[in-house]
Amino acid sequence: MAREYKIEDYRNFGIMAHIDAGKTTMTERILFYTGKNHKIGETHDGASTMDWMEQEQERGITITSAATTTFWQGRDGKKRRFNIIDTPGHVDFTIEVERSLRVLDGAIALLDANAGVEPQTETVWRQAEKYHVPRMVFVNKMDKIGADFYRSVEMVGSRLGAVALPVQLPIGAENDFVGVVDLIEMKALTWDGTIGAPATVGEIPADMADKAEEYREKLIELAVEIDEAAMEAYLEGTMPTNDELRALIRKGTIEVKFHPILCGTAFKNRGVQPLLDAVVEFLPAPTDVPAIKGIDVKTETETTRESSDEAPLSMLAFKIMNDPFVGSLTFARIYSGKLTKGVSLENTVKGKRERIGRMLQMHSNSREDIDEAFAGDIVALAGLKETTTGDTLCDPLKPVILERMEFPDPVIEIAIEPKTKADQEKMGIALNRLAAEDPSFRVKSDEESGQTIIAGMGELHLDILVDRMKREFKVEANVGAPQVAYRESITRAAEIDYTHKKQSGGSGQFARVKIIFEPHDGDDFIFESKIVGGSVPKEYIPGVQKGIESVMGAGPLAGFPMLGVKATLIDGTYHDVDSSVLAFEIASRAAFREGAQKAGAQLLEPIMKVEVVTPEDYVGDVIGDLNSRRGQISGTEARGIATVVNAMVPLANMFGYVNSLRSMSQGRAQYTMQFDHYEPVPTAVAQEIQKKFA
């Protein structure tokens, strides 16, 4: 079977937004207008197509990014293939967003016309900047009370630091919003609100003619800056044609020089079709973005993989999901080459082979079996054994490791216990499955209490995982109170000279090490050997490193993992008969325990970046409350009629904050929080923690 659509006619994009900007409704409309959905699912009644896990439907927020393939006929009459990746908008799921942005070529940022740029919009926008993803902006909910298109455009500049390029203006607002002015064609597009109805094209309303002229002029001025020849022609008085203008906007968008801005209301079916045309006209095909970089496994040098069917096969696994009918599904983006069912591929990250059994094309929650797929495709693979998120699968003869994704460490932990003996076994399976799907979720067991501890990015994150355990795996569990993931570190250098000697019939054990332990700025552990003259033979040195690493998981104060330690082995002594790797391991273990005490061990706690958006009446209460939680206020700013309070607050003092904020502001204030850094715990608090955990 040959390729059906040319790679130039692909658009791999996602929709990114704040929690309530209407992303699910927008995705639904896109699926409806592109002909894949016959009945529109409304988020309000929990029947939406993309949000296919039960909790997403109940909570009305999108958690799992599902990939959907659909098609759209552009203005030029040519059909394009859209692969849409749904991304979550809640801060506890930023890992999902990061992961989907990694495999997109472009994105639509959705704004709520009333709220404009919200905290989570900024977070997601920053993540998209990191991967240099071309973006358009759609100002949604233009029918809402307080909708203000021009303020939203201004906020794209002031809050996101991005260059906004309106290509449409709204006709009317709130209840009177009827359509848009197309600034390229200089026509008015209006809709009567009937579902699926095309726009009526007419003349621009007389009272908007001047404004439209002014904005078109700004549009042209920004667009011609992208191209020298166009700029020269413009300065000499030659205006670009509409097609030339579209080509310039496309070039600038793909180069992330500016962001086209459109508007409408997905819920009332106004403005959706022009947005789909804009996806075709302004967002990149896989061949328009730089080729993906990777490391050639054989030569260990940097290499690239072009978006072409002729190039060696390479693909990136970006999501693992458990499908009730198919079992484990691995979603992967094919960057280069052609994939055929039944082939064996190399997982270069794990160094294992994987056989491709069943291959599926997903449409939100229905699926179609396929036998082959090509560069640019996003496919779901059933039954992979070794592959986890972020792994590369490729042609075994041309092995490559594509860029790795980096995932943050979890900041919150809870103890979890199965309710019955029967739940015990099921819980282990469920937790392993969930951890394979989500790299920001960790499972470990507490050696002393024997309890199972789960760790994640926030309270909502863990709530949802416990909920999934109950629903998908039928595991009933008791959940403890959330615990902070404290860490320990050292404050000064200490030199330790330690000898391990054991003599008990036959050969004994002997090792002497002299190690300097000192703090360093990073969070990782650094080991260095400065042994000269063979006082510790080369083959024993890894034992020294291993010994230290084995005890760094439990610091001397309260048994928390240690961060930011550098150990330098400077001297030692060995015995021809009694020394071994194990003896040096034991010696360095004891040396570290002694060193951590002498080097001024201290407790560290996670500090969260908190942003509260509140009506002005409650600002005093919000600030007072954050101060009482050991928070440091870093500033306040006006946002429309609301005030934004920014603060750094220890995570330990933020549990249950959502309820306090709700009652303090009569439900009118909102907040977002994300991990920022670790900081030493004040002495009085540290003593309490040590008492509790020692």
Swiss-Prot record:
Sites binding GTP sit at 17-24, 86-90, 140-143
Task: State where the protein is found.
Answer: Cytoplasm
Which domain of life does the protein's organism represent? Bacteria
Any one of the GO CC terms: cytoplasm
Q: Give residue ranges for domain tr-type G.
A: 8-287
Provide a GO biological process annotation: ribosome disassembly
Quote one Gene Ontology molecular function term.
Answer: GTP binding
- Provide this UniProt record's keywords sorted from A to Z: Cytoplasm, Elongation factor, GTP-binding, Nucleotide-binding, Protein biosynthesis
Q: Which PROSITE patterns match?
A: G_TR_1, G_TR_2
Q: What is its main location?
A: cytoplasm
What Pfam families does the annotation carry? EFG_C (PF00679), EFG_III (PF14492), EFG_IV (PF03764), GTP_EFTU (PF00009), GTP_EFTU_D2 (PF03144)
Indicate yes or no for the key word Protein biosynthesis.
yes
- Report the protein's function: Catalyzes the GTP-dependent ribosomal translocation step during translation elongation. During this step, the ribosome changes from the pre-translocational (PRE) to the post-translocational (POST) state as the newly formed A-site-bound peptidyl-tRNA and P-site-bound deacylated tRNA move to the P and E sites, respectively. Catalyzes the coordinated movement of the two tRNA molecules, the mRNA and conformational changes in the ribosome.
Q: What family is it from?
A: Belongs to the TRAFAC class translation factor GTPase superfamily. Classic translation factor GTPase family. EF-G/EF-2 subfamily.
Q: What is this protein called?
A: Elongation factor G
